[in-house]
Amino acid sequence: MGTTTNLRSWLYLILLFIVVVGVNAQNRRPKNVQVAVKAKWQGTPLLLEAGELISKESKQLFWEFTDAWLGSDGDDSDCKSARDCLLKISKQASTLLAQPVASLFHFSLTLRSASPRLVLYRQLADESLSSFPHGDDPSATGCCWVDTGSSLFYDVADLQSWLASAPAVGDAVQGPELFDFDHVHFDSRAGSPVAVLYGAVGTDCFRKFHLSLAKAAKEGKVTYVVRPVLPLGCEGKTRPCGAIGARDNVSLAGYGVELALKNMEYKAMDDSAIKKGITLEDPRTEDLSQDVRGFIFSKILDRKPELRSEVMAFRDYLLSSTVSDTLDVWELKDLGHQTAQRIVHASDPLQSMQEINQNFPSVVSSLSRMKLNESIKDEILSNQRMVPPGKALLALNGALLNIEDIDLYMLMDLAHQELSLANHFSKLKIPDGAIRKLLLTTPLPEPDSYRVDFRSVHVTYLNNLEEDDMYKRWRSNINEILMPAFPGQLRYIRKNLFHAVYVIDPATACGLESIETLRSLYENQLPVRFGVILYSTQLIKTIENNGGQIPSSDAVTNAQVKEDLSTMVIRLFLYIKEHHGIQTAFQFLGNLNTLRTESADSSEADIEQEHVDGAFVETILPKVKTLPQDILLKLRQEHTLKEASEASSMFVFKLGLAKLKCSFLMNGLVFDSVEEETLLNAMNEELPKIQEQVYYGQIESHTKVLDKLLSESGLSRYNPQIISGGKNKPRFVSLASSTRKGESMLNDVNYLHSPETSEDVKYVTHLLAADVATKKGMKLLHEGVRYLIGGSKSARLGVLFSSSQNADPHSLLFIKFFEKTASSFSHKEKVLYFLDKLCLFYEREYLLKTSVESASSQMFIDKVLELADEYGLSSKAYRSCLVESVDEELLKRLTKVAQFLSWELGLESDANAIISNGRVIFPVDERTFLGQDLHLLESMEFNQRVKPVQEIIEGIEWQDVDPDLLTSKYFSDVFMFVSSAMATRDRSSESARFEVLNSEYSAVLLGNENATIHIDAVIDPLSPTGQKLASLLQVLQKHVQTSMRIVLNPMSSLVDIPLKNYYRYVLPNTDDYSSTGFDVDGPKAFFANMPLSKTLTMNLDVPEPWLVEPVIAIHDLDNILLENLGDTTTLQAVFEVESLVLTGHCAEKDHEAPRGLQLILGTKNRPHLVDTLVMANLGYWQMKVSPGVWYLQLAPGRSSELYALKGGNDGSQDQSSLKRITIDDLRGKVVHLEVVKRKGKEHEKLLVPSDGDDAVQQNKEGSWNSNFLKWASGFVGGRQQSMKGGPDKEHEKGGRQGKTINIFSIASGHLYERFLKIMILSVLKNTNRPVKFWFIKNYLSPQFKDVIPHMAQEYNFEYELITYKWPSWLHKQKEKQRIIWAYKILFLDVIFPLSLEKVIFVDADQIIRTDMGELYDMDIKGRPLAYTPFCDNNREMDGYKFWKQGFWKEHLRGRPYHISALYVVDLVKFRETAAGDNLRVFYETLSKDPNSLSNLDQDLPNYAQHTVPIFSLPQEWLWCESWCGNATKAKARTIDLCNNPMTKEPKLQGARRIVTEWPDLDLEARKFTAKILGEDVELNEPVAAPATDKPNPLPSNDISEDTEQDLESKAEL
């Protein structure tokens, strides 16, 4: 009784307190904010998403899941709600998965991360249907169909008929194109006709088609593929759970939302009344269990529910008074340390961190009053001696992650990758402890380049810096290389530091031009030792065709065969070198080139015999007494030095350099361009490497630099497929995952070993896929055998015969004999020599002859038996190969191999390829591939991928394995499986030593003995990064078995509040799925009880590839004042992922990025949907895409005339016109392109600067690009966002005629959108020419985007909404307003269509009083930009003219400082002169200094005008009262409402006072807007104040609703 009385008495005190402070419960009712982000595409079924997710674990599991769901296990008739279905689907999948993968699966399912893959299938389904028109009735297609490439079947009976007469395996049939992501039924036989089923599990038609096709696949009739699609309108034809998630657009998670407390020194709030908007989904209820100033209100209400209104009123008051964004300096000092203390001591540290940093303004006061434990502070300060204060680091299993790019989808992919690896290793019986060690292993970085050891007698050096007289005056102190020098400045040291050796055919134009370059650089005393290795292209082709050997010859043959010119030149060169010295020998080559160029029509022409004779005679004539012609004749007849010249070509062949045609080696580094620029770049790249070794004493004055470099890291052979380096990453497949029902096809492989090593553990396994019915396959197999004969202690070789079952009988016989040898005699000493002879015999007698010429099978058998006896093998064993049952087993094995190659490795079933510990080399160039390449591959794979795990595997104590099974083969298999699986990890090779940081007092340690994943983190909890990481780490802790060590690293001695925002990171939840119906509500960001009287601005923190825009937002999201919401309790906004961003980098080897290169992207049917150009900055480019299969190519015109795309990622030189790009997730894609100049175009430039109108006109007429960054129909479900029309065409429309005026502007917030409409009207009312407006769409409100199409139609103008995603490499701005400013200047060259030639930027708050056509047509004298200088008339403002003093006065040196409210961009000149690239370089340098670029969009072009010249417009083109004064107002062509820093007059007030026509334009715009939106227009707007010479003074403290000011005007000062 006493307790109740006490409770009631203090509640009465609470009520009394409320009355005293004057709190009105109704008015102070707390307000909330709710935000959702949806995908642009129509929803996708959750059941189909589950299939895609489970297939990531194993391709086979997709089929098991599908069969289980179609069976009784998938009966969902008892599911009464979306949540029931979610749990049913998750439970079904969990039966096929182990923990914690099953938990991660459930989370990924609620995350909807597989939805984009289904959108991709939808695109392919549309293309399938469009290939076979089905009339006007779309319903005729049904909900399922089968595509065979030649027909579509909507009925199972029709399919059965086709299956009965389907083409046989191996018959040439053009079926649908298959992709890596396709679900191919595991019983499908490679090479059989393809049948693709489009349909959805859960529909009756899918069941029927599936059963029929699965049966046919098992019978070997068809390759059965499923592409899961639920066509529109079929949702009602599926079982209860089959359509969950498909009805509405997908609601996404994995992003952050911030509500920042806005600095209201300048206000940008519209004074129009707030309109009542549509009601969205019911917002969440308030969480009363949260602590508010020590009270838990849920407990109070449980005890006294009848006092609910009084209790809630008190709670509301407490909430409204908790917000603080200011503290005294002394309270701030230890705030970071106090926060760390609160987190570390919490029962749930991660939850505590999230509650603090995501609600910081509400908790900062209580944090600042906490008593600090000095031990925490001391440890933090101690750690900060090793890591900078505030620095954030995150590592997953030892691999550092990029904090800037990290998002939930990336984190889930990385976690899944680690858990899958652990699962595969567990199946190999590897103990848990060893698995954790393996996963913590950091991969070695792939070297960017490799050195080839070319030291040989075949190198002829022209000079020697250490010995030649011409260098004697140079200094010999090697330490001078460490002296500072200007970029590009050479060091002249008498030491052979740089060795440039050209590998050339001296009879080719390229080879002889290289000699000219070499001699020129030598004569100019470049500090390089020059040399050559000469070879004959023709002889190397002969060597390739002769199995890698020089054909044996005799005198008779020599007399009959005409010697090729290259070999002749090499012999003459060697002769002259031997008799007349090196200088004369090089002079001979120079004379040869002179004669070639003088007599040839083209500089590309090769030499003729007369050139050789003439050059020889001319060279030695002054040096000999005998007639040079006689010497030449004698040399020809006697073939003097022939062996030496042939040996030189053989050396080049063995090095593998002949395929490069013309190349040079810089200290062993290979460059396939011989231009002078390439050589100088190579020197600059090599210099820091040499400097480092000199600095550390590894290179001294007596060191032979070349010997040292090549002895340490020189490879014996160059093969670009193996040592591609750079951006072409090797391709890996996990052999550990290539199992079906626990069995791997690789278990049946019998391996061959080098002599006397069959019992040794082999760290590297080469699997040769060889079709021995082809010369390529046989050559590869034979080289493999020779490789083992040559000796390898660390590798074994297995053969996967990829020959077709329909191969000729001799091939099948050869396979049987080879397999028998490998299975029964691999341990025999002479087995390899037997196989060598077997290969030779088979090649000679059967492979190289026609079936008519080849010997009989019996002869083959006899020969094999004879060889077996000769090499000590049992001929009886070979006779057993000939029984019929063996033939059947062989055919089964060939089928298994074909399935393995096709479905597991993604290769053609008859491919000739090499798989070395999972690394795939394909295609293999059999002409140049030697056994030495397998040695090279062995060395590379051992050093890069086996060494890091060798010690761990060798240290394992195998407890769950039968000791009898622990053979060398078992361990070799483990190395093969583990290293191949580890190689497929997508992870950084960077790591950090977290263990050096102390963690006793200031770290959060979350242990888990069974953890597969360990997280190391260094976090500043009071930072934007900390806000996001707090949520991400909680996800890992909840859904993945992780251990964590989180070291807190707050800033010390703060002087300002570190976080002035509220933040929510949106995560999915089971509660998003209805428990009463089949609706999926989707995750949302929910901010409860936000401050009422603070102005907030909303920003989204989305993954890097997302482009988002608001689609539902009644209120001004830039200026949220919740006390103005009235009866509405929750402000709601919905954003949409408008598109994903495809980004990339384009490079030309050994050259700068090909800036200006034009790229186009589209589908197979519509190849040009999007286009862009390549920046000079990192060769960067970007395009907007949706999920789907896209094809990238060079644009028609100069780009494709000069360049070609370089072929795949295996280092091959093939040039392809198309690059296929798959977008099937929400992470976008980064694509690395390499282009090569086309033959004959090597010296042409892509951009040819043009002056004058002719070039512009030509550009216009030949323009191929008229739809830059537009969506075609269906492209991301795109709405029409452009009033169509060519940007620069002359046309007549609705009374407007002439050339179109293009005007560009940007606005954010309702006030500036209001200004923007007025600016549009003022432009249109002053010109009769067509006008097209370009608006940056990122920040436009949904209302504006709804109104502008109607406005365009009413007022007869065109418009287009454009956007560009801020590149990840460019220094980011944090303030929204500064980002907006940056968009005005940083991306002008890439944000517009390439066909747009000129555009005028006009500030949204500007009023136009003239025909803008005059400005558009103005000659700006070839400058890329034209701005108006700041006025100088108003003397009252002299004290504010910053450009006339200090830094700006010194920097400008008499040039004017221009205002950025109006400017013209000549886009043709802007792109030609790389103005955009230059501006971005200046920006990147300056923006990192917080004191630079205070007015970003204005300061940047003014600062850069020495490099990016500006044409100064006449003053009349831009007038603003602050700087110009009223004397010149009458002549003003445009009026800008720029700020007055002296009076700070509100902008709306100034507009009404200064511009007479402004109120009428404003009223007209508001009336039109109200009409379109169906609202009442407010007519009680203040009328224009009388025009005065002085602005009205600022009100004192009482700011009226007209007192509006803007942030943007800071840029205009």
From Swiss-Prot:
An example Gene Ontology molecular-function term: UDP-glucose:glycoprotein glucosyltransferase activity
Q: Which phenotype arises from disrupting this gene?
A: No visible phenotype, but activation of the unfolded protein response. Loss of seedling growth inhibition in response to the pathogen-associated molecular pattern (PAMP) elf18.
Q: Write down the SUPFAM superfamilies for this protein, in alphabetical order.
A: Nucleotide-diphospho-sugar transferases
Which Gene3D superfamilies did the record assign?
Spore Coat Polysaccharide Biosynthesis Protein SpsA, Chain A (3.90.550.10)
InterPro entries given in the database record: Glyco_transf_24, Nucleotide-diphossugar_trans, UDP-g_GGtrans, UGGT_TRXL_1, UGGT_TRXL_2, UGGT_TRXL_3, UGGT_TRXL_4
Task: Give compartment(s).
Answer: Endoplasmic reticulum lumen
Sugar attachment sites are N249, N373, N1010, N1526
Gene Ontology terms, cellular component aspect? Answer: endoplasmic reticulum; endoplasmic reticulum lumen; mitochondrion
Where are the annotated segments for Disordered?
A: 1578-1613
Question: According to the UniProt record, what happens if one changes E306K?
Answer: In psl2-2; loss of response to the PAMP elf18
**What span is annotated as the signal peptide, if there is one?**
1-25
Q: Give the metabolic or biological pathway.
A: Protein modification; protein glycosylation
**Main localisation, per the record?**
endoplasmic reticulum
Keyword terms: Endoplasmic reticulum, Glycoprotein, Signal, Transferase
A Pfam family found in this protein is Thioredoxin_14
User: Which cofactors does this gene product need?
Assistant: Ca(2+); Mn(2+)
Q: Looking at the record's lineage, which domain of life comes first?
A: Eukaryota
Quote the EC number. 2.4.1.-
Output one GO BP term.
Answer: plant-type hypersensitive response
| Effect noted on mutating D1497N | In psl2-1;; loss of response to the PAMP elf18
Q: Which family does it belong to?
A: Belongs to the glycosyltransferase 8 family.
Domain remark from Swiss-Prot or TrEMBL: The N-terminal non-catalytic domain is assumed to mediate recognition of proteins with partial folding defects.
Q: What job does the chain carry out? A: Recognizes glycoproteins with minor folding defects. Reglucosylates single N-glycans near the misfolded part of the protein, thus providing quality control for protein folding in the endoplasmic reticulum. Reglucosylated proteins are recognized by calreticulin for recycling to the endoplasmic reticulum and refolding or degradation. Required for elongation factor Tu receptor (EFR), but not flagellin-sensing 2 (FLS2) signaling.
Instruction: Identify this protein by name.
Output: UDP-glucose:glycoprotein glucosyltransferase
Q: Which organism is it from?
A: Arabidopsis thaliana
Upper taxonomic classification of the species? Eukaryota, Viridiplantae, Streptophyta, Embryophyta, Tracheophyta
